Every structure is written in C-alpha cells, then in structure tokens.
UniProtKB/Swiss-Prot annotation:
Membrane topology: Single-pass membrane protein
Keywords: Membrane, Transmembrane, Transmembrane helix
The name this protein goes by in its record: Uncharacterized protein C887.16
One cellular component (GO) term of this entry: membrane
Cell compartment(s), UniProt: Membrane
Length: 109
C-alpha cells in the first residue's frame, strides 16, 4: 500500500509532463503548416478548388516536416533538458527517501 502511494505523485507528474510535451508539439506544428499553406497557395491559384486543397495540404505538410527536421536540434535539446530535469528530480526524491529511512532505522536499532 505504501509503495503505491509513493508512486502516485510520479504518475501525476509524468502525465502532466507528457501532456505539456504533446501540447507543445501541436503548437509547434500548427503555425508551420499554416505558413506553408499560404506559401503553397500562391503557386496554385489557377487550379480547381478541390485539387488546390489536396495539393496545398500535401505540400504544406511536406514543407512543415522539412522545417521540423531542420529545427530538430532545438527540439532534441528540449527533450534532453526535460529528461535531465526529470532524472534529477527523481534522484533527489530517492535520496531524501533514503535519508528518511536511515533516520527511521536508527531509531529502531
């Protein structure tokens, strides 16, 4: 029972961080795709609306992926920083738990 209670805050923290990362990725891609849509539209003004929509979406997503690959190093750094932050938090919490356990053990011996 105590083990589950100790793990609960980590689950909450993990879910919160995953949600932040997902939201960040969605916010990261949306402006890029919109910018690429506007750029691609300028070259296809003479096409029919349905064909135009298909071409614009396909090319906008392709260009957004290219832009993402070019800025991958920044995102890679962000993930490494987030992972390091999580590991440090986890280790500090474990050390404090071990310290508290050693105090409890000394009281019994």
């Amino acid at each position: 029972m105590a083990r589950t209670n100790l793990q609960y805050p980590y689950k909450v923290l993990w879910c919160a961080q995953v949600k932040v990362v997902k939201t960040g990725l969605i916010n990261f891609f949306a402006p890029s795709i919109q910018r690429q849509r506007e750029r691609v539209c300028e070259g296809y003004l003479h096409e029919t609306p349905l064909l135009l929509m298909q071409v614009v979406e396909r090319e906008a997503i392709t260009l957004a992926k290219t832009e993402f690959k070019n800025s991958f190093s920044n995102l890679h750094f962000f993930f490494l920083f987030w992972l390091l932050n999580f590991i440090l938090f986890f280790r500090i919490h474990l050390y404090s738990c071990n310290f508290r356990m050693s105090i409890i053990c000394e009281e019994y011996y």
